[in-house]
Amino acid sequence: MKNTPNPSPRTHCIRCGECCLHSSPTLHAKDLAQVVGGSIRPDHLYTIRKGELVRDNVRGGIAPADQEMIKVRDKKGGCVFYTAEEMACSVYENRPAQCASLKCWDTAEFMELYRSPKLQRQDVIENGVLLGLIEEQEKRCSYAALSDYVRRISDEGEKAVEIILDLLKFDFHLRPFLAEKLGLRVEEMDFFFGRPLTETIVTFGLKVEKQPEGGFLLTRIERNGVLE
């Protein structure tokens, strides 16, 4: 079919849902009131920690995050707040700033917001004990350290693997333990401590298999029958 120019350039949202289906928003400092006020809850969110490999939908490509970012969770079919049946946002009146600024026909406002400060966990969390535990996790399980030990596998072999497994175990067991001790919901852990390293380790070409006795086995991911 021959493409014909649109004689009337779009000037308003037609609720096609493409932006909601494509990806979920990252929160900015402007979104603090919605999070503190409860319109957007911790269980709606997850944190991308500094150094975590992410896809940049604006600049393109995959690269380590240069700063912490808080994102709205995705679900099958787009953003967790998007209701496909109604083609609408369930928190529209309190939607994130990125959503409010995004106009697919004119991205100037969105790009201005994109360059503004991102919301950080320390902006939201007032519990000093919890903030201290987040800092301790970052010291022990930073992506910079994980990336370094992954690179050292080729030279140090099992020694580097054991250190990586220790990092994964600490991060894995920290979550249910603190959920119980601090009265937090398990669904909130990805906001407070980022996604589990046992899941994000795949970005390094590795995967974790949980053993029957409770231990972890670290292996390389096979693609098309070839080990990466």
Task: Report the location of each language-model feature.
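Hydrophobic scaffolds flanking metal-cofactor catalytic centers in soluble metalloenzymes
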Residues: 1-228
